[in-house]
Amino acid sequence: VVIASLSSLGITIYSLAAESRQSGLETFYAMLFLLIAGVLGMVSTGDLFNFFVFLEISSLAGAALVAYRVDNGVAVEAGLKYALLSTLGALAVLTAIGILIGQYNALNLATLASRLQFTTLDKLALVLLAVPLAMKCGAVPMHFWTPDSYTTAPSSVTAFLVVSSQASLYGLFRILFTLYGPLLSWAT
């Protein structure tokens, strides 16, 4: 949380100077602060559904910020690609959460970890959680959205997209090792 907060502060200060000549700054800063709130929420929650909500907040705000310069058609295309992939990933994450809550009637990561039985549905939920989060953090081979998004977004947005990607990586590791740690250690 401290690293994300300090990064957010630095990027916001940088964006004050970098974006000062642009129009529509109210929308830019509203989306930037939504992105910051989404990232801070993702790293601080211990609940799968709240993690999903914060992931979606950061995804939608990130897509809007990538397409912020609407006069650049490539930026709009990159923002649309980012939004489409984030939406497909969100559908998979929501399906995984539905599978887990349907089996165990719990959303808290610690409670789920104590109840997990590593059934076939649990393994399916693992895949449905891991793949979208790996895509969101830009892991190979699901990193195809990053070149367009990083090159067309304003530099302050690109910096914060990297922070957002690292928050998704943290969420991926937290879910993998908290929920599926015993299953992953058994496989080795």
For each predicted feature, which ranges?
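Hydrophobic alpha-helical transmembrane segments in multi-pass integral membrane proteins
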Residues: 1-40, 171
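Hydrophobic cores of alpha-helical transmembrane segments in multi-pass inner/ER membrane proteins
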Residues: 2-9, 97, 126-133
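Alpha-helical transmembrane segments of multi-pass inner-membrane proteins
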Residues: 3, 81-86, 127, 161
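C-terminal ends of transmembrane helices
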Residues: 9-21, 64-78, 136-151
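Transmembrane helix-loop junctions and nearby membrane-interface residues
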Residues: 9-12, 16-19, 44-47, 97-104, ...
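Alpha-helical transmembrane segments of multipass membrane proteins
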Residues: 13, 37-41, 64-65, 98-99, ...
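Alpha-helical multi-pass transmembrane bundles of energy-transducing inner-membrane proteins
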Residues: 27-124, 135
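Short helix-boundary/re-entrant hairpin motifs in multi-pass inner-membrane proteins
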Residues: 78, 124-187
